[in-house]
Amino acid sequence: MAREDVGAPPDHLWVHQEGVYRDEYQRTWVAVVEEETSFLKARVQQVQVPLGDATKPSHLLTSQLPLMWQLYPEERYMDNNSRLWQIQHHLMVRGVQELLLKLLPDD
């Protein structure tokens, strides 16, 4: 089975509302936390979501996910708290573009 090319991952992901992010092309991405033993993962899928007004960061519920991710060298993202997230995979899953990000431990 041929693997579908998904291109480059988004350069930026900004939180729009709880669990929903926007990229630099205004596409929406839904993020879900996956906790495994001692590390945190985020499954982020590019899904069309109708957007209302953006939620103010101070009004967001407490979340383990950041307000923003920015693409960083070596297949990683840096979040607004200066934490690094490794891109575990970036592929198409049943026609949906998906990123799996793993929070790296502090050095």
Curated annotation (Swiss-Prot):
Molecular functions (GO terms): protein kinase binding; protein serine/threonine kinase activator activity
GO cellular component, one term: mitochondrion
Tissue expression: Not found at a significant level in any tissue.
PANTHER family: PROTEIN P13 MTCP-1 (PTHR14060:SF8)
Family statement drawn from the similarity comment of this UniProt entry: Belongs to the TCL1 family.
Assembly behavior: Interacts with AKT1 and AKT2 (via PH domain). Does not interact with AKT3.
Purpose of the protein: Enhances the phosphorylation and activation of AKT1 and AKT2.
Name of protein: Protein p13 MTCP-1
Lineage of origin: Eukaryota, Metazoa, Chordata, Craniata, Vertebrata
